[in-house]
Design a protein with these regions (language model features):
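N-terminal, active-site-proximal structural segment of metallo-dependent hydrolase catalytic domains
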Residues: 1-47, 57, 62, 78
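Structured beta-strand-rich core segments of catalytic domains in phosphoester-bond hydrolases
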Residues: 37, 42-109
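Active-site beta-strand/loop signature of hydrolases that rely on acidic residues for catalysis
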Residues: 7, 23-41, 101, 130-151
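Conserved CoA-thioester-binding segment of acyl-CoA-metabolizing enzymes
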Residues: 17-20, 117-127
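Short catalytic/ligand-binding loop motif for oxyanion handling, primarily in non-cytosolic enzymes
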Residues: 40-42, 62, 110-113, 148-157
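Surface-exposed cleft-lining segments at the edges of enzyme active sites
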Residues: 81-82, 107-123, 158-163
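Active-site-proximal beta-strand elements of phosphoester/diester hydrolases
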Residues: 1-9, 98-110, 142
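Metal-dependent phosphoesterases centered on the DNase I-like endonuclease/exonuclease/phosphatase
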Residues: 51, 125-168
Length: 168
């Protein structure tokens, strides 16, 4: 299976820069997109041979996730079942025959770590969601986790320490 996960940071701009050419060229079985920044009806992608699943944020121009897959899933879930989080369009889950595929755009803690408490609540709730899925069958998680695990993951680790996504 060929799976591509990509934070597009605005799908409309990405389409203008050749997304569809890339999409056709790589011919992946599954595309998981994060930070689509779309509202329903803002874009109509013609992707023959793919099923499309979109989760939009209520806030215009904010977050959003999507999965395009050649194989139709058994079921689809949007969000993680926690109202506090689900209005931001951060998760799409496909139930395939042998596994769950979860596309996620994890919240950023923001400058000055203003949203760190929310992020920690998100982490607990998302972990519980994944553990619940894992009790039934395997889970594949892909997406933008908004975290740098080690200094090597950052261009400027010293100046980024204690910034969103890189805290002790």
């Amino acid at each position: 299976m060929k799976l591509i996960s990509w934070n597009v940071n605005g799908l409309r701009a990405c389409v203008e820069k050749g997304f569809l050419d890339f999409f056709k060229e790589v011919d992946a079985d599954v595309f998981c997109l994060q930070e689509t920044k779309l509202q329903q009806g803002q874009i109509d992608l013609d992707l023959p041979g793919y099923y499309q699943y979109w989760n939009y944020a209520e806030k215009k121009g904010y977050s959003g996730t999507a999965i395009f897959t050649k194989k139709e899933p058994m079921s689809v879930a949007y969000g993680i079942g926690v109202e506090e989080h689900d209005h931001e369009g951060r998760v799409v889950t496909l139930e395939m025959e042998d596994f769950y595929l979860v596309c996620v755009y994890v919240p950023n803690s923001q400058d000055g770590l203003k949203r760190l408490d929310y992020r920690m609540t998100w982490e607990d709730d998302f972990r519980a969601y994944l553990c619940g899925l894992a009790q039934k069958k395997g889970v594949v998680v892909c997406g933008d986790l908004n975290v740098a695990h080690k200094e090597i993951d950052l261009k400027n680790p010293k100046s980024n320490r204690m910034n969103a996504g890189f805290t002790d």
